[in-house]
Amino acid sequence: GLLKNELQKIEFYSKNKKLTSEAILKLTNLTENFSMSELIDNCLAKNQKKTILILNENNFSNEDCIQIIRLFLNKLKKILQLSKELEKNNNLEKTISEARPPIFWKDKEITKKQISIWKTKNIKNLIYKLNEIELSMKKNFNISINLVTNFILEQSTLKTNN
């Protein structure tokens, strides 16, 4: 059903026109392309359904894994900084509004959720785990996608001990 509709859409559009691969990609929206940042944000927000959806919809390669790890580490360092600030002032709104660099308005809600879930000790443990995974990936590049996927699924489903 769905595939037939997409093929009919392409056929209708392509009458008397030269069809490019870009046009086909725009016409067919069988899969939604999510960014690595969305994957990491949803994982850290413990949004298991969305995390699994992103993993299933995207076709990440072993090469993408290093970039995912780097983005994950950068995000965790930012959350660690915010978490430490929250421990000092005990005010989530103040922590978010006074963050430097400022948090983009679209990211504020998910960042609040992440800070509420992850405490300083847990964040540090995640950073250590990610460094170990990166080292394992460099030793055996062929299993990169398995290491990263397992880590992401584990973090999105695990209950944190705060």
Question: What are the functions of these language-model segments?
Answer:
Residues 22, 83-86, 127, 142-146:
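Short coil/turn segments at secondary-structure boundaries
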Residues 1-41, 45, 116, 133-144, ...:
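Non-catalytic interfacial helical region
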